A protein has these predicted regions:
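A residue-level marker of the well-folded mature domains of exported/periplasmic proteins
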Residues: 37-350
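Conserved functional hotspot residues at active sites or interaction interfaces
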Residues: 357
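Short, hydrophobic alpha-helical membrane anchors of single-pass surface/secreted proteins
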Residues: 13-17
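N-terminal secretory signal peptides that target proteins for export/translocation
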Residues: 1-12
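Bacterial N-terminal signal peptides
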Residues: 18-30
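Short, solvent-exposed mixed-charge patches
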Residues: 360-361
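Sec/Tat signal peptide C-region and signal peptidase I cleavage site
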Residues: 31-35
């Protein structure tokens, strides 16, 4: 009898040890998940950034930040599949799918074709793409767009209130909707703040030339501009860096350029950066994951605006002490007015054209 009893104890110990090992192994596999979540509750989410990695001080990094926040708040397991080049887009999306992710998020319009193709081939997987949209969608694909006209208007309001010369500058990469949908509302907002303000507008016809951007900024300052807003990628970063170091107020775009261009305040001129007109990619990614977790994910275009914190002005950072409180209050009031639908921020130019005084070189 004692021999049989000993065998039962060994069996029980082995069973307990096996269960314990399985439990510990599950913790290693998913260190970011809640202990309250059972494996069947966990949702797998993959992020495929654009080339450049998740430390790009841009959309990739913001998307990764939104994913990390979702890991903290929801029962999800995340993975990132960075392509080394554009040639790897399709392969990395396929890797995301084959790993069992229920949602695969891609970043940037360059990945549009690869994302659409993957959505068509994998109808049981949800897909979302940052900063790209289509006219029609399959049932498992979401395009995230951003109300750049709202935050552009807000940036213009600030520019108009801060300008003493009554001349503001705008530098665009190309005369295309993603650029002009920031720039013309910027003008509109500035002229609401001060009807006498005029805008100098120059297109660089190049997104990748910071030296050219700096030259255009200096030219606009020579023509009287004391606030410069650049919507021109690295060309624009060169413009605002030069302008700020020469003593003009500047406004960045897309991301908080206080960190990407001014090194978090370590680069000369940061005190002349008023703000940045941001696309809050982090919030868009977070809310898309939240929809999947809640079972409310829908296909089509997701508009990220001031109301849902999908766009917004970056903090004033080192310039805050130089921005009068009544100006800060006015900008906050205009933001609320836009959210309430009380302020017309300008119809995109391809819908209808308005005539405002522009000085174009």
């Amino acid at each position: 009898m004692s021999h049989q009893h000993t065998g039962q104890n060994k069996t029980q110990r082995r069973l307990i040890l096996g269960v314990t090992l399985i439990f510990l192994f599950s913790l290693v596999l998913s260190p970011q998940t809640s202990l309250a979540a059972s494996p069947k509750d966990l949702i797998l989410v993959g992020l495929i950034p654009d080339e450049g990695g998740i430390d790009d001080n841009g959309f990739n990094e913001m998307a990764a930040a939104g994913l990390a926040r979702a890991v903290t708040d929801f029962s999800i397991v995340s993975a990132i599949y960075p392509p080394a080049s554009a040639d790897e887009y399709a392969a990395k999306i396929a890797e995301c799918v084959s790993a069992g992710n229920e949602l695969c998020i891609t970043v940037g319009y360059s990945m549009m074709d690869a994302t659409m193709n993957a959505a068509g081939l994998n109808i049981d997987v949800d897909f979302a793409i940052v900063d790209a949209t289509w006219d029609t969608y399959p049932a498992n694909l979401r395009g995230m767009t951003f109300a750049s006209e709202e935050v552009g208007y807000l940036a213009g309001t600030l520019a108009g209130l801060m300008s003493t010369s009554k001349i503001i500058g705008a530098i665009g990469g190309f005369p295309i909707p993603p650029v002009d949908n920031f720039i013309f509302p910027y003008q509109y907002g500035a002229q609401w703040a001060d009807p006498e303000v005029q805008m100098l507008l120059d297109y660089a016809y190049n997104f990748m030339n910071p030296v050219l951007g700096a030259q255009i900024a200096q030219d606009q300052m020579a023509r009287g501009a004391d606030v410069i807003f650049a919507v021109a990628g690295p060309t624009g970063n060169g413009a605002i860096l030069q302008a700020a170091q020469d003593g003009a107020w500047t406004i960045g775009v897309d991301v908080d350029v206080y960190y990407s261009t001014f090194g978090g305040g370590t680069v000369d001129g940061s005190e002349y950066l008023l703000t940045s007109a941001m696309k809050r990619v982090d919030n868009a990614v977070y809310h898309t994951i939240e929809d999947v977790v809640n079972g409310t994910f829908s296909s089509g275009t997701m508009v990220n605006n001031l109301e849902n914190e999908g766009v917004g002005l970056a903090p004033y950072h080192d310039a805050e002490a130089s921005i009068p409180q009544d100006v800060q209050d006015a900008v906050a009031a205009v933001m609320q007015s836009i959210i309430n639908g009380e302020t017309d921020v300008w119809e995109p130019f391809y819908k209808y054209t308005i005539n405002l005084p522009i000085t174009m070189k």
